[in-house]
Curated annotation (Swiss-Prot):
Residues 1-78, 615-657 are annotated as: Disordered. Belongs to the ATG22 family. Residues 26-40 have a biased composition (Polar residues). This is Autophagy-related protein 22. It holds the Pfam family ATG22. It is a multi-pass membrane protein. GO terms for cellular component: vacuolar membrane. GO terms for biological process: amino acid transmembrane export from vacuole; autophagy. Keywords: Amino-acid transport, Autophagy, Glycoprotein, Membrane, Transmembrane, Transmembrane helix, Transport, Vacuole. Residues 1-91, 177-187, 234-317, 371-384, 431-446, 503-515, 576-583 are cytoplasmic. SUPFAM superfamilies: MFS general substrate transporter. It is found in: Vacuole membrane.
Length: 657
């Protein structure tokens, strides 16, 4: 019996229209997801196109075909990373890194200690004003100052200020992580904190002996803004790597271009003749050898991981090196200004003003060239203004605890963050401790202290670019390169502890007993920092689950800056207890060595697999929640239509039965 192929009446095929024009209730979940996935990127005009964008060469056409053109969410920017976008990323490192080298690691602690000392008295009688630290005699006692009713050593004033600033910074970073991951806020927040931080640094020009507490407040504001902006900058790095043309090409299998091959240009009889002349057996290849060579298999997961890690490390190293070059140039200018102004407090304030101006001016290219790269928007909860901002902050803190729970499932993330917690604290504490040691114990003048940072920055440039060459030469993995840097880093506190050996102390040299000894140690510190800054950031970026960059980099920043609350505080307590800085080298020696075992056990390939699985589970969970929400809304809408049409509710109808 033949099947009935007659068309059914239209009334039997069409679904009854719902009243009140509720078009969305009649759409399937698939249709809605298709609408979301096919939304175009209309968030901003494309002002980042280079002059080569219009080039219609075959190479560009092939690259265009490999673009990930299907957006993941409304406003998703899936364009390949452009050269101008990379320059914008480097530009902000060029602008802001000067604050770290010339400001927080050099002249800010010097200025804070100087201002505190000008307001301090000797602990021996608590009446005699303290002299300048660069001319202090060995027989002088401790210099103390009262801050909010607390008696602290003037050398500890800067350490405690740094601790407060990084605590505030950690709290702020958590609060903004949600806005960075969701919506078109990543770039906006980056620029906002850049302007706030740079203007705060310029405001040091107004700080005097009478309002030195305001100088500490500016330190908190500027350091907090810098840290928040760099968290946002770091969250761009995985996106720049993911959409880099080299990575896109590695992820897509290459197929033969038959239109440009010899199949198209050869006469038909020659092609057939060649095929007929070739004996065909069970083991014959499907393609002719010369045609099969045109096929390129898709890169393996390990090869893609290696490619992304190499690219991430290179971009990160260039960013660090670019920032170091800028800081080196500006530091030399600042030293010249200090010498011309006779190493006065006014000279220190002027150079900090110059640092703020530099930060402001060179943020402009980053603002012009860096693409926003929006994340998926949050669900509209109907809140506006301040309430919407509070909702974002609350969601960010909830996300932090959720991110911590997710990170606990990633072994390599846990190992890295634990090691980075200690290592970043050691980096920050060693820098500030060394500057204060040189100023208060070795009595070095401000221009000489500035030379310490010139040497460390110069060495940092070679370290940023040289460690990649070293790792290739010795075939070192990223975590192995970090371990080598840690081993060199350990030499700094150990050298300071040599001053406790009686025979070294009798020599009067070595063990940080002479000012010139600070310079070779500064070179070691710079080389180490140049490697750690680039490799740690890129290694962590490869372990982050895709789609959670800002949230996990917020956790990275909390681990980084949050740990720096402890180091300076402990060193400050040691100074208050002993009256000298040298005992702090015992603490630094332990702090530098602890991260090594944790870094040793990191496996990047395993970490990327676990991160990808976690990202997939998060996506599946979100899709399932959306499906359930859409199904529920559609059922409620259909039920409402039915009730309006029949004049009674389902419950009433059941009750009537």
């Amino acid at each position: 019996m033949a099947p009935n192929l007659q068309p059914q009446p239209q009334s039997q095929l069409q679904r009854p229209r719902l009243k009140d024009h509720r078009p969305w209730s009649g759409l399937s979940n698939i249709s809605k997801r298709s609408f979301r996935s096919c939304a175009t990127s209309a968030f901003e005009a494309d002002d980042e196109r280079s002059s080569s964008d219009g080039d219609m060469s075959p190479r560009n056409s092939e690259a265009d075909l490999r673009r990930p053109v299907v957006p993941r969410h409304f406003g998703h920017d899936a364009r390949p990373t452009s050269r101008r976008e990379l320059l914008g990323w480097y530009a902000y490192a060029f602008a802001a890194e000067t604050y770290v080298i010339c400001g927080i690691a050099s002249f800010i602690p010097i200025l804070l200690e100087t201002l505190a000392r000008e307001n301090g008295v000797l602990v021996s009688d608590r009446k005699t004003p303290c002299g300048s630290s660069d001319s202090k005699n060995d027989g002088d006692g401790q210099c103390i100052v009262w801050v909010f009713g607390m008696e602290i050593n003037t050398a500890s004033f800067a350490m405690y200020t740094f601790s407060v600033s990084v605590l505030v910074q950690a709290l702020l970073v958590v609060s903004i992580s949600c806005a960075a991951d969701h919506g078109n806020y990543r770039k906006k927040l980056l620029l906002t904190f850049a302007w706030i931080g740079s203007f705060a640094v310029m405001s040091y020009i107004f700080i005097t002996k009478d309002n030195y507490i305001l100088g500490a407040l500016l330190t908190v504001i500027s350091n907090t803004s810098f840290g928040a902006s760099f968290v946002l900058l770091n969250s761009f790095l995985p996106l720049l790597v993911r959409y880099h043309p080299d990575v896109i090409e590695a992820n897509v299998a290459t197929t033969p271009d038959l239109g440009s091959s010899e199949f198209e240009s050869r006469p038909l009889d020659q092609s057939v003749g060649q095929l007929e002349s070739s004996p065909v057996t069970a083991t014959s290849p499907l393609l002719h050898p010369e045609d099969g060579g045109r096929l390129k298999p898709t890169a393996s997961h390990a090869e893609i991981t290696s490619k992304e890690l190499e690219l991430s490390t290179r971009i990160s190293a260039i960013g660090i090196g670019t920032g170091y070059i800028a800081a080196l140039f500006l530091q030399c200018i600042c030293i010249g200004v200090l010498i011309s102004l006779h190493n006065t407090t006014w000279g220190q304030r002027v150079v900090l003003f110059m640092v703020g101006v530099w930060w402001t001016v060179f943020t402009i290219p980053a603002a012009m060239w860096l693409r926003p790269r929006p994340g998926p928007p949050l669900a509209d909860n109907g809140r506006k203004g301040i309430m919407a901002g509070l909702a974002y902050i609350l969601y960010a803190w909830k996300s932090l605890f959720k991110t911590i729970q997710q990170a606990r499932r990633l072994l390599d993330i846990v190992l890295f963050l634990a090691g980075w917690f200690l290592l970043s604290d050691a980096i920050a504490t060693t820098s500030s401790t060394a500057i204060l040691f040189a100023k208060t114990q070795l009595h070095m003048k401000p221009w000489a202290l500035g030379m310490i940072n010139v040497i460390s920055t110069t060495a940092g440039v070679f370290g940023a670019f040289g460690w990649s060459w070293v790792s290739r030469l010795f075939n070192l993995k990223a975590h192995q390169t970090i371990l080598v840097c840690i081993a060199l880093f350990e030499l700094i506190p150990l050298y300071g502890l040599l001053g406790y050996l009686p025979f070294v102390k009798n020599w009067g040299v070595f063990g940080l007993q002479q000012p010139w000894e600070m310079y070779p140690l500064a070179a070691v510190y710079g080389v180490v920092l140049g490697g750690l800054s680039g490799y740690c950031r890129s290694l962590y970026g490869e372990l982050i689950p895709p789609g959670s960059e800002a949230a996990f980099y917020a956790l990275y920043a909390i681990t980084d800056k949050g740990s720096s609350v402890f180091g300076p505080t402990i060193v400050g307590a040691i100074i208050d207890r002993t009256g000298t800085i040298r005992p702090a080298f015992w603490f630094l020696a332990v702090l530098v060595g602890f991260p090594a075992p944790l870094i040793w056990f990191i496996d990047v390939e395993r970490g990327r697999r676990e991160g990808a699985k976690l990202a997939k589970s998060i996506t599946d969970s979100i899709v399932q929640e959306e499906d359930e929400s859409d199904d529920g809304a559609e059922r409620r809408g259909m039920l409402s239509d039915y009730e309006r049409e029949h004049g009674q509710s389902i419950d009433d109808e059941r009750a009537g039965r």
